[in-house]
Amino acid sequence: MSAKQDDTQPIQAASKRLLKVILEGEALTRLSPLQEMDRAQAVADLEAENVFSLERPLPGMTPVSEQGPYVLHLSIQEGRLIFDIRRQDDTFLTVLALALGPFRRLIKDYHLLVDSYVKAVQEAREARIQAIDMGRRGLHNEGAELMRHRLNGKISIDFETARRLFTLVCVLHQRI
């Protein structure tokens, strides 16, 4: 590779990412300590490292004007997951709405696992805690695959970004 190509790669990588994630919604005021911990960790991890970019140009815009880094306002409104995507200066870029239906079973399972985890911690059952952690990892992996599938053709994300976004969807959504 030439030096010129090497110089552009960090710029391209920096433009295909989320700079900031903002969660919106009343559900955030009623989080359990474990859900709050999941939320804080997912947001911190997302802001530190992620892959996120629009896959196709928006009408009337050039691909260069749509490059990130992006600010993501994530919320749930009227049964839909809302990706309000903005430029680095927080000016509006686009909104993507996904139906929550395909996520419902996984969200319900997430809340059941959170309840089971809290109970296992209270009872100091180490083997149970480890089993629940394994289940949570599997659930998050399944949620990540579904997230990537649902965003396919719209937003390009890697597996770890999808996993963290799935965590935030679960935190935003009240019990089903």
Swiss-Prot record:
InterPro entries: UCP032146. HAMAP family: UPF0262 (MF_00678). Belongs to the UPF0262 family. This is UPF0262 protein GbCGDNIH1_1393. It comes from Granulibacter bethesdensis (strain ATCC BAA-1260 / CGDNIH1).
